[in-house]
Design a protein with these regions (language model features):
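Short glycine-/polar-rich loops that comprise or flank the Walker A/P-loop
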Residues: 123-127, 150-154, 196-200
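AAA+ P-loop NTPase catalytic core and its hallmark functional loops
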Residues: 78, 98-112, 156, 164-167, ...
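Conserved G1/Walker A P-loop phosphate-binding module
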Residues: 2-103
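Canonical P-loop GTPase G-domain recognition
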Residues: 162-229
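Conserved beta-strand segments of the P-loop GTPase G domain that flank and frequently precede/overlap
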Residues: 128-133, 157-159, 203-204
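Conserved nucleotide-binding/hydrolysis micro-motifs of P-loop NTPases
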Residues: 105-108, 135-137, 160-164, 207-210
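Switch II of P-loop NTPase G domains
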Residues: 82-88, 99-148
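P-loop/Walker A phosphate-binding loop and immediately adjacent motor/lid segment at beta-alpha junctions
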Residues: 144-158
Length: 229
């Protein structure tokens, strides 16, 4: 069992160990087991990799997940031109052992797909977030397949949903729920075509953080990971 799955297993085992210690030694046993486990979990590092095509909104998403404005100190640089050139880790705001890894955009002159896929060790990450823009591309599919092959859970973030809503709104008979549903279904079927059994898709806008699926994404990342710590 690898990555998050094995850490989840450890977490379930943790609960069993606590119960056993309590039955054996009462409250004192439970306390010492908590101390032992806390020390053990202090060394667990979790790595969330954020990947996708250039300009899809990876760095902006990481800043949003960390609760930082783009011009705040410590925020990942973002721009409308190719920006991230080195893999950069950013700590989770409340879980110090958890880091988001901001990747350079796939499919630029500096990072052509072939080199990118060859050089990236997908196995070293615990969770993959793929950020896709207005279309799920062949490169997004390559990333999904590589993460799946490495046995990593995948979240697909369909970014810039505010732009989609804004342009679709002009159509006659526009219905926001239906539009979002269509986009969601398209993302799910693209992931299924890439061989992902249970696609997890989040429609997000970095500029409307309390709308669409961003609150759910933030909560899901924390709830899934905090179980493992
Ligand atoms: N409207 C809208 N624009 C966004 C959103 N997310 C990012 N952007 C814009 O998209 C552009 C690129 O964002 P970045 O976060 O720098 O994209 P990136 O994927 O990190 O880009 P590279 O590092 O070059 O690969 C910036 O101008 C952002 O302001 C969003 O949800 N909605
Ligand atoms: Mg970037």
């Amino acid at each position: 069992m690898a990555g998050v799955l094995s850490k989840l297993h450890n977490s379930a085992q943790h609960v069993k160990d606590l119960a056993a210690a309590y039955l054996r030694d009462g409250e004192k046993g439970r306390q010492s087991d908590i101390e032992r486990k806390s020390n053990q979990f202090a060394n667990v590092q979790l790595r969330i990799v954020v990947m996708g095509e250039s300009g899809s909104g990876k760095s902006t998403l990481i800043n949003a997940l960390r609760g930082l404005d783009e011009d705040e100190e410590g925020a990942a640089p973002t721009d409308c031109t190719a920006t991230t050139t080195e893999i950069t880790p950013y700590p989770h705001p409340t879980l110090p052992n958890v880091h988001y890894y901001d990747f350079p955009g796939l499919n630029t002159v500096k990072f052509p797909v072939k080199t990118f896929m060859k050089k990236t060790n997908f196995a070293q990450y615990d969770l993959g977030i793929i950020v896709t823009g207005s279309r799920f591309t062949e490169n997004d599919q390559l990333l999904a397949k590589a993460l799946e092959k490495a046995g990593k859970p995948i979240y697909l973030v369909r970014s810039k949903i505010d732009e989609t809503v804004r342009s679709e709104r002009r159509r006659k008979g526009y219905n926001q729920e239906e539009t979002l549903q269509r986009v969601r279904e398209q993302c799910i079927s693209s992931l299924k075509a890439a061989g992902i059994q249970e696609p997890r898709v989040f429609l997000c806008s970095a500029f409307d953080l309390d709308q669409y699926d961003f609150p759910k994404l933030k909560e899901t990342v924390v709830s899934n990971l905090s179980e493992t710590l």
